[in-house]
Amino acid sequence: MARRGKKYIEASKLVDRNKRYTLEEAVDLLKKMEEVLQRRFDETVELAMRLNVDPRYADQMVRGSVVLPHGLGKPIKVVVFAEGEYAKKAEEAGADYVGGDELINKILKEEWTDFDVAIATPEMMPKVAKLGRILGPRGLMPSPKTGTVTTNVEQAIKDAKRGRVEFKVDKAGNVHMPVGKISFEKEKLIDNLYAAIDAVVRAKPPGAKGQYIKNMAVSLTMSPSVKLDINEVLKKLQEKAA
């Protein structure tokens, strides 16, 4: 097990391991940790959720996407697999890379994945399917469930550039996603966190039984995690929706 540095240990002391925090308290703690850790880069704030599902069963799979209200705080590179009129629309909408067979072959030959989001028109998917072994493990494969297989390429590009985050439960029932940078104002981080949690709640599959969310925590890229009070967070979500 890797040894923790002095600053990490100091940051850990800020967290009460026996307490479950509100989102507001947790973001305040992350801000304090950032001051202690003194990283030389703008750390990403990450959300982790442990769900009471078994993704081996189709009716317990959790997958979706969310457009964070305040984005991710970084430029998003978008690839669009399209031809003809759709390719023209994608270029006009600001896609970073647009193409058909040539772009697909480039990814196949070079295993090139220097982009954050991949979008495809439905007619391109039989060809894009060949990229599954490359794009799939990196979470880049276009999917109708996340809105990245569509004829409305302009809207998909707009959402991606704004900071749409895709999520998918792993084999152990965990969901991880970035929700912004620690340099964001507190309220913007809180807004993004509520939006992300709400998206996972709405993605609850029909086969999920009992308490859907078992654990929830936030952290920086390289910091201790802060566990959240699930009931309090869900209560606030309901109040926001009312």
Curated annotation (Swiss-Prot):
It comes from the Bacteria. PROSITE patterns: RIBOSOMAL_L1. SUPFAM superfamilies: Ribosomal protein L1 (SSF56808). Transmembrane segments: none annotated. Pfam families: Ribosomal_L1 (PF00687). GO terms for cellular component: large ribosomal subunit. Keywords: Repressor, Ribonucleoprotein, Ribosomal protein, RNA-binding, rRNA-binding, Translation regulation, tRNA-binding. GO terms for molecular function: rRNA binding; structural constituent of ribosome; tRNA binding. InterPro entries: Ribosom_uL1_bac-type, Ribosomal_uL1, Ribosomal_uL1-like, Ribosomal_uL1/biogenesis, Ribosomal_uL1_3-a/b-sand, Ribosomal_uL1_CS. The keyword Ribosomal protein applies. GO terms for biological process: regulation of translation; translation. NCBIfam families: rplA_bact. Belongs to the universal ribosomal protein uL1 family. Part of the 50S ribosomal subunit. Binds directly to 23S rRNA. The L1 stalk is quite mobile in the ribosome, and is involved in E site tRNA release. This is Large ribosomal subunit protein uL1.
